[in-house]
Structures are given as C-alpha cells and as structure tokens.
Amino acid sequence: MPFTQFKSLGDVLKTYNIKYIEDNFKIESQIKVPKHLVTDLNFTLKNIAYDVSEASICENLIYPILRSVWMPYVDIFSLWSHKPIEYDTFLSGIPDYLISKRSDLGKIVFEVPCIAVVEAKKK
C-alpha cells in the first residue's frame, strides 16, 4: 500500500505499534557551505524557473543542498533519489530522497537504517 493510503500519521502508528514522541532534535555542528553551492543556488534562483513543478524544485534546489551536505559523509552514508522502498505489503512508496548506511557491497546496494527526506506539500 502506498504511503498515501494511510489517512494520518496516527494510522501508521497504530498499524505498526510505533510510539510517538516529540522532542527537540538539534545537533550543533559547524557546516561550511561550499562557495560553489552558494554560486549555483544564486544562479538558479535568478535564471531558472525552479518553482514550476515538484520535479524542478527537487532537481534545482533540494538535491544540490542534500548532495553538498552528504558529500563529507560519502564513506558512511549513501544518498538515494526517488528510490522505491517497501516495508511490507501495506507500507511502501517512493520518497523524494533517502539517506542510508553505505553498504560494504557497493553503492548500488541499499542498506538500513535510513532517513527519508520529503518535501512539504500543501495537500
């Protein structure tokens, strides 16, 4: 069942017996933003119709930022774009991006645990 078949987060929590907890999640770290990323993003914002579609936003804004943040951790994590995942027959889908443990078997092998990264939508 695609992620969208669940009507609420509560439905997922009940179905999979997951405990919901809210807390502050803040890891303080110094990240130096590469100059080329700033240059590329400024170019995109000025010259590309980046907000005409979900795909355009993903390709022109979200992915370059994720890739830049991920690059220093390339030996530890893998970055996946629009990779189908399936927990079981009831919970499956295609998140915009996934970050997973880097597999010892190579870059094409998906490992868990993973973090799903999705863009917020108005719907």
Feature map (PLM): residue ranges:
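A short, conserved, highly charged catalytic patch centered on acidic carboxylates
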Residues: 2-4, 9-123
